[in-house]
Amino acid sequence: MPQTEIFYHGTCRLFDKFSLSFLGEGEGKSKFGQGIYITSSYKTAALYASKAAKANGKDCCYVYTVEVPLLTDDNHIFSCKSVNEDVISRVEHKIGEVIPDEVKNAGKYFRKYLGNLLTGQKVAIKKMMDKADAEAESKVSEFLKSVGVVYLAWPHSQNNPDGDTNRAVLNEDDIKILKIEQVEVDEKNKLIESSVKEIQYK
């Protein structure tokens, strides 16, 4: 069984290694948590590249084909699914307290609650699982990485949680670049298939 998967990353920048130090320089949003965003859909990566280019005043769009670790039951948190018991156990062991049951029902609640807990927030559970600021998102990503979580994951379409997925990779060293392609999109941000051109960058 393969130990890796192929995913895609859309950007307006050229580089030969991923780095967490550049977080927020793409489209500037981290709605699903902090990490390096990748997707199982090439066309979605092209869309993200276009959005990043517009946000940064750039003309060029690039899609990186990357190799990443295989998604397993206990190495990720999925936004709209219950959190794996092994992940919960590792987290509770490290923080020394029990996570409330209502927080375990969905990865997005778990992530936000834990982030707020790590930054010392002392408010109602409902508030802690509802919103998390940038500091909380940063702390929770670092913490989850330390207990063996590789990904924050969410569905490409909220109506189809078992279809294409997007992920935030928590450790830059888990991403291997296989190739870089320059792409163009039309006025509706749809990939122009004939525009795809592999480029060499060192």
Locations of regions flagged by a protein language model:
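Active-site rim elements
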Residues: 35
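Active-site and NAD+-binding cores of ADP-ribose-processing enzymes
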Residues: 2-31, 39, 52-202
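Short amphipathic alpha-helices within nucleic acid-binding modules
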Residues: 43-49
